[in-house]
């Protein structure tokens, strides 16, 4: 573990909470100090759930460490069963309680409760949230699911959706509609929405649909081996992936690969006249591996973007992420350090960022358009409306979500043609985004600099000379360390496409600083360009 301001994933017990909270009739008894109860807010405040998670905490304090914490845990188990009467109980420790090394599974078994008890041993200091969810779901399946006779009608299970998942609620509905349109019934959705009784009948399905490998792949692999159920490998995000998914499901179910795409609008919208401005837009993607790999395909093949960078924060999926990145001629960024992600974005200077809530903050600081494609997300990404990411309707949602942050094509032309216009100037931003407009008549630093006398450095032929030649008295006209752009240089800079303009500005200012210049003229800009082109 390491101390950080932001984190992409919580500790493993948060993943276990996501599984328990998504289920019905399940209760999670967590051996944890009072401070770890913060996790409740993730579900009630961020996800807007109408009830608190089915989790009981031992909430031991410092003074309890000298006494019997095991008895505290057993009391919490007894109280949880008597109060909530769950069909099954999960038991485990938080990252803090793991240091005490109480055997929560053995302690719970010693109580001889009349319901199944699922033991969770989650290595808090080696693994993180997605692993915790994946492992918890696996242990629940191992404890409760058994081979059984298949349903008469071809059916499948949907595996992987959890509480606090990115659009999981709507993805379930969209994929269920897609499957039912093919004549395939959904036997169970798990863990989200499933009860322990539903888990027990997972074996009745003919095959499994793995929606989210991060949180369901271990259970899918176990079911393939133990329940003899094959599982799908294609995640239906985007038009192409959805068609591939339909073909894969049809092969497993022995039905015709047909699906109702009458509601699909994304391909035509992407090919419409105004959408030609999408072609070649440089995009950077970061998030969980499943969503990033799927989104990269949509970005390049369906929207016409140029993928200039991609990566994931979950190291368990580093191998498939690196393999996918190679297909775009890229090296994947696999890190859980948001500062590394920010550095990569600054270096690449993309026109659009597709990422998590973290990248939304980064994009805001850098002034780059951004859309969220992956957890972790904030409250606004749990919308009241129907907004899936998967299936044909999900493809429509992707188009709208990704295009909204961008300046529209016609408006880009107006910005180019009327760059100094009161309405269509660079600082105004897209017209469909409120609260960003800056009057074109606002005084600028470069105009103020016009009145200042030039130093010997800028008046010299060629635009720059070594700093020693600048008389100290004249250099004092501008505060030390401050670099000012002159009007002609600023005007020329605006002719550079805005998606690389920031990088050009930074490089020029760096060049000027190295040369000891305090004002950037047109000649300085050209010299910097030639310097970095070498």
From Swiss-Prot:
It is an enzyme of class 1 (oxidoreductase). It holds the Pfam family Oxidored_nitro. [4Fe-4S] cluster binds at residue 36. Keywords: 4Fe-4S, ATP-binding, Bacteriochlorophyll biosynthesis, Chlorophyll biosynthesis, Iron, Iron-sulfur, Metal-binding, Nucleotide-binding, Oxidoreductase, Photosynthesis. The active site is at residue 274. Protochlorophyllide reductase is composed of three subunits; BchL, BchN and BchB. Forms a heterotetramer of two BchB and two BchN subunits. This is Light-independent protochlorophyllide reductase subunit B.
């Amino acid at each position: 573990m390491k101390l950080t301001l932001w984190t992409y994933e919580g500790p493993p017990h948060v993943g276990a909470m996501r599984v328990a909270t998504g289920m019905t009739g399940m209760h999670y008894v967590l051996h944890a100090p009072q401070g770890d109860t913060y996790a409740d807010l993730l579900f009630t405040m961020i996800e807007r759930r109408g009830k608190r998670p089915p989790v009981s905490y031992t909430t031991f304090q410092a003074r309890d460490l000298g006494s019997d914490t095991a008895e505290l845990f057993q009391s919490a188990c007894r109280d949880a069963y008597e109060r909530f009467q769950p069909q099954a109980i999960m038991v485990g420790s938080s990252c803090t309680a793991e240091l005490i090394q109480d055997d929560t599974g053995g302690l719970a078994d010693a109580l001889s409760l009349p319901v199944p008890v699922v033991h969770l041993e989650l290595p808090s200091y080696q693994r993180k949230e997605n692993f915790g969810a994946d492992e918890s779901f696996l242990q629940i399946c191992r404890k409760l699911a058994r081979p059984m006779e298949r349903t008469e009608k071809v059916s499948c299970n949907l595996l992987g959706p959890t509480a606090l998942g990115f659009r999981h609620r709507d993805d379930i509905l969209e994929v269920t509609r897609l499957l039912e349109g093919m004549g395939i019934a959904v036997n169970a959705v798990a863990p989200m929405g499933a009860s322990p009784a539903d888990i027990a009948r997972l074996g009745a399905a003919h095959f499994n649909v793995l929606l989210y490998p991060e949180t369901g792949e271990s259970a899918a692999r176990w079911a393939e081996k133990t329940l003899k159920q094959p599982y799908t490998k294609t995640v239906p995000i985007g038009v192409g992936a959805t068609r591939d998914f339909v073909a894969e499901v049809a092969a497993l179910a022995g039905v015709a690969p047909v699906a109702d795409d009458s509601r699909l609008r994304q391909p035509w919208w992407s090919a419409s006249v105004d959408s030609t401005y999408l072609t070649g837009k440089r995009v950077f993607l970061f998030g969980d591996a499943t969503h990033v790999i799927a989104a990269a395909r949509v970005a390049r093949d369906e929207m016409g973007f140029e993928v200039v960078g991609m990566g994931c924060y979950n190291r368990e999926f580093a191998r498939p992420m690196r393999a996918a990145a190679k297909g775009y001629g890229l090296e994947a960024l696999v890190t859980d350090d948001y500062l590394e992600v920010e550095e990569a974005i600054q270096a690449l200077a993309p026109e659009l960022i597709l990422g998590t809530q973290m990248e939304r903050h980064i994009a805001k600081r850098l002034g780059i358009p951004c859309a969220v494609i992956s957890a972790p997300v904030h409250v606004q990404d749990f919308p009241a409306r129907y907004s899936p990411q998967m299936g044909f309707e999900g493809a429509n949602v992707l188009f709208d979500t990704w295009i909204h942050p961008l300046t529209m094509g016609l408006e880009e032309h107006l910005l180019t043609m009327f760059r100094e216009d009161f309405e269509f100037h660079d600082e105004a931003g897209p017209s469909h985004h409120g609260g960003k407009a800056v009057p074109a008549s606002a005084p600028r630093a470069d105009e103020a600099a016009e009145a200042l006398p030039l130093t010997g450095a800028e008046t010299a032929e060629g635009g720059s000379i070594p700093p020693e030649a600048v008389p100290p008295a004249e250099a004092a006209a501008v505060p030390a360390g401050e670099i000012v752009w002159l009007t002609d240089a600023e005007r020329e800079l605006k002719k550079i496409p805005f998606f690389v303009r920031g990088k050009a500005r930074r490089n020029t200012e760096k060049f000027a600083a190295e040369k000891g210049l305090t004002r950037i003229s047109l000649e300085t800009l050209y010299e910097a360009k030639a310097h970095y082109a070498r």
